[in-house]
Amino acid sequence: MNLTPGSLYFMRERDHVTGDISAYVKIGLTRDDRTSESRKGDHQTGNPREIIVIEELVSPAISELETQMHARHAIDRITGEWFALSETQLSDAYLLAQKLAKNLEKHLPGLQRVEQIAATLSTEEEIKPDSTLLDIHEVYKTNAAELMAVEDELKGIKETLRDFAKNTGGINGIASWRVSAPRPKIDEKRLQADHPKIHSSFTSSETSMASRFTATKPRRAKTTKEKPETDEPANPPLDRLDFFLDRDQTVEQLHARHLILLARQSELTWEKDFIEAQMKVACGNAKSIAGICSWPRLEAIKSKFDKRGFTAAHPDISDSYTFTPAPTYSFIVNEFHPYALKIGGTK
């Protein structure tokens, strides 16, 4: 978790001519001791409406707090950092932000301790858990089971929407295909095989920490979804990426459910992060806690190829081993709704 502190702000816009205040609220952050008033100036530039800072608060781990607020209000999110909030909803959102900030303050010493432990190599010791750790683990397993159920439902909704949008670029306001733009890269394996001495002269070793935390949790339930008779293509039809289907009530309801689930997923992930921090602190320098978690932190030596130096020294060879990977395609369900939902209010 990024513990960098900052300020969370809530902004509205006011029309200079009519004095009307927008129904939309921007929830954003500032870092590096910048005030919300100074950030307000960034948004004011070129904006014909007056920016008003309604509320703000200071918190550690400000990026985590902002992410939580955006996800928990996904059902109210219109686009980007803008949310459709009534005065009552805005008040509730600010109270939630205060609650989450206090939660971060409470757990900050433990989170800072985790950062310290993460920077040290683990021993071969395995700790025997006491009753407190066993209780924490039970809470973790309950959280993990619900989180997996939410993730599985989100995956199912995504697959249903993708099936609905087959042979098109997506569904207006709800989902679309995202096409990557791969950068050219050097085929190092082929270069090493063909020119081992040249490759070796631009390769160095660097030492880093290899770390992975895993905790024992329930197995994910097996899905019983039947496989279709004909598999859908993994990639979208490239000649129809600009063609979008119109929404209907069914897909809007699915999208609304998706947004509500995002809020719950975020809440559960928030809880999981703090539970895992407790486990890591309890683990300390040891590599594991018997039956609960494993957190080995080992020294790893990796090879690093100096691509820039190689290209400058051998431009012709570099060109012959440079290629551009094929683009990848991802079907993305919007985490906001730029249209009027029949259902409203944060869940």
Predicted regions: what they are:
Residues M1-N167, I174, E188-T250, A263, ...:
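Non-catalytic accessory segments flanking enzymatic or RNA/DNA-binding domains
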Residues D15-V17, A313-D316, S320:
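N-terminal targeting/anchoring "stem" of glycan-biosynthesis enzymes
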Residues V139, R257-H258:
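Polyanion-binding surface elements
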Residues P182-I186:
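Extended, charge-rich alpha-helical scaffold/interaction domains
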Residues E206-T216, Y321-K347:
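Protruding loop/beta-arch "assembly-hinge" segments enriched in small, turn-prone residues
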Residues C293-P296, A300:
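Conserved catalytic/binding loops enriched for acidic/polar residues
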